[in-house]
Swiss-Prot record:
Binding sites annotated in the UniProt record for Mg(2+): S102, D241, D243, D245
InterPro entries noted in UniProt: A-D-PHexomutase_a/b/a-I (IPR005844), A-D-PHexomutase_a/b/a-I/II/III (IPR016055), A-D-PHexomutase_a/b/a-II (IPR005845), A-D-PHexomutase_a/b/a-III (IPR005846), A-D-PHexomutase_C (IPR005843), A-D-PHexomutase_C_sf (IPR036900), Alpha-D-phosphohexomutase_SF (IPR005841), GlmM_bact (IPR006352)
GO annotation, biological process: carbohydrate metabolic process; peptidoglycan biosynthetic process; UDP-N-acetylglucosamine biosynthetic process
GO CC annotation: cytosol
Cofactor note: Binds 1 Mg(2+) ion per subunit.
This protein's encoding gene: glmM
PTM comment, free text: Activated by phosphorylation.
Pfam families documented for this protein: PGM_PMM_I, PGM_PMM_II, PGM_PMM_III, PGM_PMM_IV
Keyword RNA-binding on entry: no
Protein name: Phosphoglucosamine mutase
Amino acid sequence: MSQRKYFGTDGIRGHVGLSNINPEFVLKLGWAVGCVLANGARKKVVIGKDTRVSGYMLESALEAGLSAAGVDVALLGPMPTPGIAYLTQTLRANAGIVISASHNLFEDNGIKFFSADGGKLPDSVELAIEAQLEKQLQTVPSVKLGKATRINDAAGRYIEFCKSTIPSLSRLSNLKIVVDCANGATYHIAPNVFSELGADVVPIGIKPDGFNINQECGSTAPELLREKVIAVGADIGIGLDGDGDRVILVDSLGNLVDGDQIIYIIAKDRHQRGVLHGGVVGTLMSNYGLELAITSLGVPFQRSKVGDRYVLETLREKDWKIGGETSGHIVCLDKTTTGDGIVAALQVLSIMVKQNKALHELTAGIQLLPQTLVNLKTNNAALLASNPDVIQAVKNLEKHLNGEGRVLLRPSGTEPLLRVMVEGANASIVKQQAQMLCDDISQIDKKLTESLPST
């Protein structure tokens, strides 16, 4: 496969104004996408965004570039990433464009794409877009310029879709729910979904100002959610990230329920009802406890590379339906085409109602092993992951764990980080060993940096 210049594992992402996430590049990106998709015919693309202040600027740039290529644009406004995937399908668009940096803070933003079926763009199309970016921008004749329209009922359409993913007779009227929308794209959607299904909803993180997305709130910072669940005596807390494709839960006792536990709850219920359709996909970072819990049900478990893109690929290769990541990217391919935080939460809520069980009862069947994840800042992540000295340090630690744990090194696909994960039976030992390994890697990184030619 050809080397990508611009696209990462999940589109193009960076610091606004200090990377390719600037109006000049994004305008040309819109044009390049339009040229590749249009191919001489009239086409339509939908654009949605989260609540970052830079979204206005980037939306306008994309719109201008697409129009210059002769492509019509349907503007969705603030919309969760999975909502954009859904509306790309139902509006019969040729592609969907998401303006978001997901769980990152407001200084970052990104552009990612959905194909006409609501799935990820094929590699061949991404490479074609990159090739087009190297060409001189040329505007089509005025008579062929694209037009822009705003889809005023976009939120309502997606709300109805979310509600349709659980049985029509399911009512949440006996549940008190705290939902944290991370001051992001679900702020005007998630509370309505749950309240329209009858729940008593306590919403937080619903006052976006362009700068407070994911700021000490949402799925990556669940303390506020936990406190609120306890304070109001809620049955469950639902924490979404800035673009709504991740979810974590909090039970009535204040315990955090991560993506691995959510996958287990959904998969076990479908297995018991005979509708699981195959096995379950996790990732290299999924807790070993998930693998043990799933296989103990007699259900196959497969690990993919890290990233919802690879979870989706593995699910489609195997024709399975349920998978996801510890971080809360949960994919239910029998309901959606991509990870959807609201839909995943609804599956759990429906199970709670149907089985008349509290969330902590549903998680009782999975015991997670203590796991420590350290994000090591480095510009040499890929080099370190394959460095012989680093590999030997990992082997030494694995020997020390004596077969009762795992060690995983993974360069981030979007940030200058090496993710170091250590898993084992004893939490304090795992944390100590992870830090020792990171100290060793940092020393190797320092020597490696000194040996590299300066630029």
